[in-house]
Amino acid sequence: MSYTLDSLGNPSAYRRVPTETRSSFSRVSGSPSSGFRSQSWSRGSPSTVSSSYKRSALAPRLAYSSAMLSSAESSLDFSQSSSLLNGGSGGDYKLSRSNEKEQLQGLNDRFAGYIEKVHYLEQQNKEIEAEIHALRQKQASHAQLGDAYDQEIRELRATLEMVNHEKAQVQLDSDHLEEDIHRLKERFEEEARLRDDTEAAIRAVRKDIEESSMVKVELDKKVQSLQDEVAFLRSNHEEEVADLLAQIQASHITVERKDYLKTDISTALKEIRSQLECHSDQNMHQAEEWFKCRYAKLTEAAEQNKEAIRSAKEEIAEYRRQLQSKSIELESVRGTKESLERQLSDIEERHNHDLSSYQDTIQQLENELRGTKWEMARHLREYQDLLNVKMALDIEIAAYRKLLEGEETRFSTFSGSITGPLYTHRQPSVTISSKIQKTKVEAPKLKVQHKFVEEIIEETKVEDEKSEMEDALTVIAEELAASAKEEKEEAEEKEEEPEVEKSPVKSPEAKEEEEGEKEEEEEGQEEEEEEDEGVKSDQAEEGGSEKEGSSEKDEGEQEEEGETEAEGEGEEAEAKEEKKTEGKVEEMAIKEEIKVEKPEKAKSPVPKSPVEEVKPKPEAKAGKDEQKEEEKVEEKKEVAKESPKEEKVEKKEEKPKDVPDKKKAESPVKEKAVEEMITITKSVKVSLEKDTKEEKPQQQEKVKEKAEEEGGSEEEVGDKSPQESKKEDIAINGEVEGKEEEEQETQEKGSGQEEEKGVVTNGLDVSPAEEKKGEDRSDDKVVVTKKVEKITSEGGDGATKYITKSVTVTQKVEEHEETFEEKLVSTKKVEKVTSHAIVKEVTQGD
């Protein structure tokens, strides 16, 4: 009894234990292997928050809980002291109770940390919702501002159009006014011109009047001079008559004698005088008539000329007025055309500017919408994760609540010594359904092969077309015979050989499929962890209801589960590394090529040589079998290729011996490369299996070294493979056949361990598609150029024939990726059954 009294009298012993367990539990919970989904929560909230919360905020709660538990334990030990001492198992019971207290305190600490994390996540969710609301309000405000700006822009554009219309109207009015002013100016100029013309006509008439007056004066002067002359002649005549009369009077005798003559002279003078007067009158009359007639003619001519000039001037003025009106109309039409062109250019510029601005705004809105969609998707994913965490926490909280209720009922039964039947409390089943939508966006995969065949045949004929035709017929017959033999050989080979699948080209889709498989495995591991935690909670509940021995077993199981979790995490990391190395090994093992025959036929296009793809098998055995089959097929094809060539050599009997030796030397190189690939893949896969079993980092380093050696061996094989293509010149019967083959090999891309090999077969470059990190390759091109030159000469006829035949084949392969969606629906149903047992106390009285 002294032991129980000491323990009851010293409650600090009970208080000392929970503090130690609390510190130890906090250290244990800080380890990465323990805790409820500590890895998944490390992404959302830091672990420092939970640790600081445990140190600061949980101290009073833990003290209170430890005090309550210590009081309950003291009462329990005091009431059961006699029974336990009589039973002889007091130390074991105390140890089990201390372990239960440690367990409950640790669970309380975890529960408080989970509650704090839930509050923190709720606060983050509220902040995110506030940001989303602010963004939505901002977008709404932007939209309202845009509407307001659009309305203002429309109004301003309407006003601008009105102003432009008014401006055009004013411009048209000004043009019309300018036209009127121009018309008036022209009319004024015309009137001034008419005035000048009339003044000039007046001056001309005045000049004519002056001239006519001068002519009249001259004529008057002539008349006066003639009158003076007549008077002078009359006076002279009279003087002469007087002289004659005087002479007559002097000689009277003579006069007497000549009396009869006196009358004759006077009559003669009278007659002469009358004749002279008549002549002078006639001359005067004729001169006057001539002057009058001349004056009348001149006046008539002047009047006629004036009328013609006036009519011509009127016509000229009319034509000028018409020309001015037409020019004015033309200027007005030009002005309207220029204004319309300016308006059209302005409208086009405005339309282009508006279109560019609208396109910019549309692009900006699309970018914003895409960003908001991405943000919403991210928030939805985070919200889904938080919901999953919340459901798990609700389950654990319910489990802890039931545990606490069970402990309280046990304490109450032990303290009050209440007897009652055994009952079980069954918790209602909780069903968690989580839908994970997994999308892989890949473009539809299509293979489009474009082949462009150009065949150019040039023939130059010099002499004797008959001989050339005979030569051509013989050559064609030989070629037809050779092609028939080749076709027969090919048919036999096809019957013997099975269908062979060619080496695949690993596209970016395989990488995405591997990543999708890794994500599915990670999700499956998370679900397994949740199930393990549900099992832990069930075990904890059963441990709370069972007796002392079961609690020890539960603790051992929890420790073992923690160790298995740590081991599981290590195994997950190792499994990921194994997957990466296996993917690399499979990629390196898959990259082998099978030669494709290219029979040469007379005047026929080059046959196509597509690169066929085969899906890679994940299992190592299947890959090895495929590699062996590929080796066999390659050997058969090499033998088949060598056989027709050797037959041709036997027929023509002049082929050098070096060519078959070279081709035979090529085949062992390929066989060695294939054997090295197979041995390397076997060793790597065996070592990976050993690593997963033994879980030692040293062997992982060895695997990496082997992978590096493998990359080196692949480099050697890749270096050997291009040495197989060689140029051959064959001289047969004086004929020279020069075959030039152009080969294009794709550049090596990818990691340092992965290299791609290009195998040249029959002048074709069949190279596998390259793999890119981050970028999808969609185009593969194979270009083959073949030139055959033949010169035939015959000494007898002296005819030469020069034939050049060039064939170019271009092959283009386009690959597109496929889009598909995977929906993974995982439903988790957890049923928890808690059983509480009421233990009867037996007290023995002394």
Curated annotation (Swiss-Prot):
Glycosylated residues (UniProt): T48, T431
Modified residues (Phosphotyrosine): Y319
Annotated segments matching region Coil 2B: 291-411
InterPro entries, per the entry: IF_conserved, IF_rod_dom, Intermed_filament_DNA-bd, Intermediate_filament, Keratin_I
Spans annotated as Head: 2-104
Post-translational modification: There are a number of repeats of the tripeptide K-S-P, NFM is phosphorylated on a number of the serines in this motif. It is thought that phosphorylation of NFM results in the formation of interfilament cross bridges that are important in the maintenance of axonal caliber.
Annotated segments matching region Coil 2A: 265-286
Listed name of the protein: Neurofilament medium polypeptide
Annotated organism of origin: Rattus norvegicus
